[in-house]
Swiss-Prot record:
Keyword terms: Aminoacyl-tRNA synthetase, ATP-binding, Coiled coil, Cytoplasm, Ligase, Nucleotide-binding, Protein biosynthesis
Taxon lineage: Bacteria, Pseudomonadati, Bacteroidota, Bacteroidia, Bacteroidales
UniProt-listed GO biological process terms: valyl-tRNA aminoacylation
Annotated protein name in UniProt: Valine--tRNA ligase
Free-text note regarding domains: ValRS has two distinct active sites: one for aminoacylation and one for editing. The misactivated threonine is translocated from the active site to the editing site. The C-terminal coiled-coil domain is crucial for aminoacylation activity.
Native organism: Porphyromonas gingivalis (strain ATCC BAA-308 / W83)
Length: 876
């Protein structure tokens, strides 16, 4: 296979991805091997790739590819989420552009349009993931609303209802007045908003000269007030016990109640209680048995309880009521105030806490095993710092509002009988059977039943994802589930640790009796160089496809991972992708160099090459062991950095230079064979991170059969390494680096041969390497160094290079004198610090030891400099 002069990512990537697909390299079927299973966090079906997806799926692909190369039966299940609110909003928007409303169409016709939209846009993000190199088993692609997943969702709803865990009731929910649906907490984005704090006068009933002042940010909700609450420990309001106050503009008398929930320091210490429009007020209302008055229509317009403001929008009412309160003498004052207001993530309008009839799932009993599993490390979070966050959520779990006022989604399988009673069943036909038994009326038909119009929260399907992707959740004899479940690793973001991860754990224990995954790798947020979260609105998020076109998928993958420690935010800059591309070029050029060498079968292996081969073999084994350790701790960024340095520094900068034959000369076959073997191992270690270039070069190493691929090669095993040899070789590299520094500092060209003088303590084992890499004439053992030499220290051993006519003696004396003056000044500062009794008494022992080491190092350097100066001065 001929290797091109330049690396062309676009050509290489398309060629090898098509090859992997053609030969079914990603496909997994149950067999005798141990499975390694990952399920993709399903992106929105209508979404497109963004940098968060890039990070998440790069990490998954690294883990999956490495597992394959460890001999596991790796199965990465892809799929998409039907994303009820997002998709419905898109379809409603497209219809509105044609002058068509959702209501005009009716449910069935609207759903036809929604399916058309899904089929039209649904495959985009999955195709984009292929550009990234995602090695998913595409034959297993799942969709949360396909037939199999839908059947499982409905069966689970019915099962939980029959267990008494699902119920219908009135609660305060996050309401989107534009989408006209309840929202889950994670669909609410809190934004800092410049608003006002209104101080209102609530006059005491039958005491017209007395009033209390209540602070609120939402005066438009006072029509729903049913109490004013104070803290029982607040001495200021003891006189109000048992009294009632008049709600401003409304004229309704409401009781004063006492509860320690009230913060005495906020505002005036008096809280207006509006149970229908604040979740905390609702809890107070339940506790104190207060009336709940809902003053809003679903669209944010005030209803008949809004009094004179009925028919007005909530924000128009806020402006109008402010002036009305001032005119009535009921406004004490108004202050500017910054607070966090919840906005719908999908429609970007302020949400309305609203009392609403919804379906709920009781969570307390489901949460217990899910909490225990994480706290006892049956399921491990990486990094573990998120355990406390998880525990807080799970110990304070609330019932889950699972209904949405949407048409796109899994329709709730609840059916209303003519008398208003409810039956829950998987199908209308089964519902009729239940209804007949329940009522004793055999004349009931499907037409007599009315199915609930709400759909289930999208998360109600995705919480089953690790189970449902392998078939029927409720099937106890599901062979695929028995083999692939529990899955191995889940890669996701911390912001959905509760909303998705915790719920999957609950579902796993409820429906399989075991955890859904072993480990949860929590990624950070991708931010720009200024630390800002990447977003379309800020214009700071690069297009991943354009990045891959510019730098190649491997380059972008590497750039992301170099800056992606688990659980910490990723400060991404395009220069990281450039660094990744440069590394690809480095690998490519190193390969071309090696393959360009000629072999001589009969030549003897040089001593320097034999030492280099031995050293790099040990170094390679050392890195393999470190890699296994880093992967076991999910420190993937550090793992990549380790392999990067191994290739760039150890292999390219040192090993290849040590074994490189003289210009025009062939390389001995033994060294060449070892070098090709090392390259093969390096490509395997790099493959999980950089799949495309490694596949290309692996095929260029030697002829391959059709269907062969590096991804199905086993990773090389780590063998025992010789640490003493490696440490000795590190000292050898230090000697070579010092010789190079002297050449650079004194402008001595590399072609000029030098002589190195060493003491008797010098280990001569690696002299062949030092002579070659330093271009030395010889290494001589001496009792005293030659006059006019330049010396250097490696540890405590001194080395010298006779300069002779190679340098300007006067210039060298000046340079060494300046360095000596600096070192003497530095030593004086260290001695002053160590002579300070207060410092020595208070400083930690480690700090004192560091200063003492600085002292001894400076003293050794000064002695060497003085000796060198004496030698030079004696030659003048």
């Amino acid at each position: 296979m001929e290797i091109a002069s330049k690396y062309n990512p676009e050509e290489v990537e398309s060629k090898w991805y098509n090859y992997w697909m053609e030969y079914g390299c990603f496909i997994s079927v149950p067999d005798g091997r141990k499975p390694y299973t990952v399920v993709i966090p399903p992106p929105n079906v209508t979404g497109v790739l963004h940098m968060g997806h890039m990070l998440n799926n790069t990490i998954q692909d690294i883990l999956v590819r490495r597992a394959r190369m460890k001999g596991y039966n790796a199965c990465w299940v892809p799929g998409t989420d039907h994303a009820s609110i997002a998709t419905e909003a898109k379809v409603v928007g497209r219809l509105a552009a044609q002058g068509i409303s959702k209501q005009d169409l009716g449910r069935e016709e609207f759903l036809r349009h929604a399916w058309d939209w899904t089929h039209e846009h649904g495959g985009i993000i999955l195709e984009q993931l292929k550009r990234l190199g995602a090695s998913c088993d595409w034959t297993r692609t799942a969709f949360t609303m396909d037939e199999s997943r839908s059947e499982s969702v409905i069966k689970v709803f019915v099962d939980l209802y029959n267990k008494g865990l699902i119920y219908r009731g009135i609660r305060v929910v996050n309401w989107d007045p534009k989408a006209l649906t309840a929202l889950s907490d994670e669909e609410v984005i809190y934004k800092e908003t410049n608003g006002k704090l209104y101080y209102l006068r609530y006059f005491v009933e039958n005491e017209p000269d007395k009033y209390i002042i209540v602070a609120t940010t939402r005066p438009e909700t006072i029509m729903g007030d049913t109490a004013v609450c104070v803290n029982p420990n607040d001495e200021r309001y003891r006189w109000l016990r048992g009294k009632r106050v008049i709600v401003p503009t409304v004229g309704r008398a409401v009781p004063i109640i006492e509860d320690e929930y009230v913060d005495m320091e906020f505002g005036t210490g008096c809280l207006k209680v509006t149970p229908a429009h604040d979740v905390n007020d609702y809890m107070l209302g339940q506790k104190h048995r207060l009336e709940s008055i809902d003053i809003f229509h679903d669209n944010g317009i005030l209803n008949e309880h809004g009094g004179p403001y009925a028919g007005m929008d909530r924000f128009d009412v806020r402006k109008k009521i402010e002036q009305d309160l001032i005119d009535a003498g009921l406004m004490e004052r108004v202050e500017n105030y910054v607070n966090k207001v919840g906005y719908s993530e999908r429609t970007d309008v302020p949400i309305e806490p609203k009392l609403s009839m919804q379906w709920f799932l009781q969570m307390e009993s489901l949460a217990k095993p899910a909490l225990d599993a994480v706290m006892n490390d049956e399921i491990k979070l990486h990094p573990a710092k998120f355990k406390n966050t998880y525990r807080h959520w799970m110990e304070n779990v609330k019932d889950w509002c699972i209904s949405r006022q949407l048409w796109w989604g899994h329709r709730i399988p609840a059916y209303y009988l003519p008398d208003g009673s409810i039956v829950v069943a998987e199908t209308a036909e089964k519902a009729v059977e239940l209804a007949r038994k329940q009522t004793g009326s055999d004349s009931l038909t499907v037409e007599d039943l009315r199915q609930d119009s709400d759909s289930l929260d999208t998360w109600f399907s995705s919480w089953l994802w690790p189970i449902s992707v392998f078939g029927d959740v409720m099937d106890p004899e599901n062979e695929e589930l028995d083999y692939y479940y529990p899955t191995s690793d889940l890669v996701t973001a911390p912001d959905i640790l509760f909303f998705w991860v915790a719920r999957m754990i609950m579902a796993g224990y409820e429906y399989r009796g075991k955890k859904p995954f072993d480990n949860v790798y929590l990624t950070g947020i991708v931010r720009d160089g200024q630390g800002r979260k990447m977003s379309k609105s800020l214009g700071n998020s690069p297009d991943p496809i354009m990045l891959m076109e510019k730098y190649g998928a491997d380059g972008v993958r590497m750039g992301l991972m170099m800056a992606a420690p688990a659980g910490n935010d990723v400060l991404f800059d395009e220069s990281l992708s450039e660094q990744g591309r440069n590394f690809c070029n480095k690998i490519w050029n190193a390969f071309r160099l090696v393959k360009g060498w000629q072999q001589a079968e009969t030549s003897t292996q040089p001593e320097a090459s034999a030492l280099a081969v031995k050293w790099f073999g040990y170094r390679l084994d050392e890195v393999k062991t470190e890699l296994d350790d880093l992967f076991s701790k999910y420190r993937l960024s550090e793992a990549l950095t380790l392999v990067y340095k191994l290739f760039w520094d150890d292999f390219s900068s040192w090993y290849l230079e040590m074994v490189k034959p003289a210009y025009g000369q062939p390389m001995d076959a033994k060294t060449y064979g070892s070098t090709i073997g090392f390259f093969d191992q390096l490509l395997r270690l790099l493959h999980p991170f950089m799949p495309f270039i490694t596949e290309e070069l692996w095929h260029a190493l030697e002829p391959r059969h059709d269907g062969e691929t590096i991804m199905l090669c086993l990773l090389p095993d780590a063998h025992e390494t010789d640490r003493d040899f490696l440490q000795a070789f590190d000292r050898t590299r230090e000697i070579i680096a010092a010789i190079r520094n002297i050449r650079t500092g004194k402008n001595i060209p590399f072609k000029e041969k030098l002589t190195l003088e060493a003491g008797n303590e010098h280990d001569a084992s690696f002299d062949a390497v030092i002579i070659k890499m330093g271009n030395l004439e010889a290494i001589n053992r001496v009792e005293e160094k030659t006059s006019g030499s330049t010396s250097f220290l490696i540890g405590t051993l001194e080395y010298a290079i006779p300069m002779g006519a190679l340098i300007d003696v006067g210039e060298e004396i000046k340079k060494l004198s300046d360095e000596l003056a600096y070192q003497e000044k530095f030593l004086a500062s260290v001695m002053k610090k160590l002579g300070n009794e207060s410092f020595v008494a208070k400083a930690p022992q480690a700090v004192i030891e560091l200063e003492q080491k600085k002292k001894s190092d400076a003293e050794a350097r000064i002695a060497t400099l003085r000796d060198s100066l004496n030698q030079l001065q004696s030659t003048k």
